[in-house]
Amino acid sequence: MSLITEHSIALNLTLPEKDVHKKMEVFYNPVMASHRNIAILLLNSIENKAMNIADPLAGSGIRSLRFLKELKKGKINHLFVNDMKENFPKTIKENLQRNKIKN
């Protein structure tokens, strides 16, 4: 396992030796970090809007964790997070605790 840091979030993940693939224990694609940065900038630029956000194929949950930590207060009304991997509930709970995010 490796401790990965992306902006304000730290994740403990097992990374593949080569390319990212769907058979990973928990999916995380570091190349998409810039897309997550843009999403946070965009959502923070929307004025006076409490949003309902869905992240149905969350993988490691990095996008949702960053939303919870980096979006301005009051931006999120509800955040729905899920993934098909069997160990996702355990993983997201551990990462919420690791990053001191109250669920």
Predicted feature locations:
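SAM-dependent transferase fold signal centered on methyltransferase-like domains
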Residues: 1-103
